[in-house]
Amino acid sequence: MAKADKATAVADIAEQFKASTATVVTEYRGLTVANLAELRRALGDSATYTVAKNTLVKRAASEAGIEGLDELFAGPTAIAFVKGEAVDAAKAIKKFAKDNKALVIKGGYMDGKALSVADVEKIADLESREVLLAKLAGAMKGNLSKAAGLFNAPASQVARLAAALQEKKAGEEAA
């Protein structure tokens, strides 16, 4: 690879690091081209799965200000640059790694911190943002309904008490 090509590749990878919300580093030893294509399809638009030389990736990470990943760049390494929700991409990679033992999750990077394999798996086990928002909305709606019932209860109790008093007075006047 010519020096100019290497510089261009480093700049491209550094730009991907900067543009991504998270990255997941994997080892792809033993995967076929068809397997990699299947993984890229599983990731969809949530991430870009890139294979690059480790030395170029190390330089690009340094250029992008990302630290703590150097030890992950050994052996055949590929990186998933996550554009959207990190949970969706981590779920897809974890599921693919479960089905294809040749794919090994090495770690990742998110919110300025290097992630261990356990961290990436924890992220994969989280609910997606949409599901969490739906659960929050449901909980809020339930609590609002309870609060409305509590606020309405004293008024209805007063109304029932007034009706009972009125009936009692009407009964006393009739007698």
Curated annotation (Swiss-Prot):
Matching Pfam families: Ribosomal_L10
GO cellular component, one term: large ribosomal subunit
GO biological process: translation
Species per Swiss-Prot/TrEMBL record: Mycolicibacterium smegmatis (strain ATCC 700084 / mc(2)155)
Family statement drawn from the similarity comment of this UniProt entry: Belongs to the universal ribosomal protein uL10 family.
The protein's name in its UniProt record: Large ribosomal subunit protein uL10
SUPFAM superfamilies to which the protein is assigned, alphabetical: Ribosomal protein L10-like
Functional summary from the UniProt entry: Forms part of the ribosomal stalk, playing a central role in the interaction of the ribosome with GTP-bound translation factors.
Lineage: Bacteria, Bacillati, Actinomycetota, Actinomycetes, Mycobacteriales
GO molecular function, a single term: large ribosomal subunit rRNA binding
Oligomer and partners: Part of the ribosomal stalk of the 50S ribosomal subunit. The N-terminus interacts with L11 and the large rRNA to form the base of the stalk. The C-terminus forms an elongated spine to which L12 dimers bind in a sequential fashion forming a multimeric L10(L12)X complex.
Annotated keywords: Ribonucleoprotein, Ribosomal protein, RNA-binding, rRNA-binding
InterPro entries: Ribosomal_uL10 (IPR001790), Ribosomal_uL10-like_sf (IPR043141), Ribosomal_uL10_bac (IPR022973), Ribosomal_uL10_bac_type (IPR047865), Ribosomal_uL10_CS_bac (IPR002363)
Superkingdom in the source lineage: Bacteria
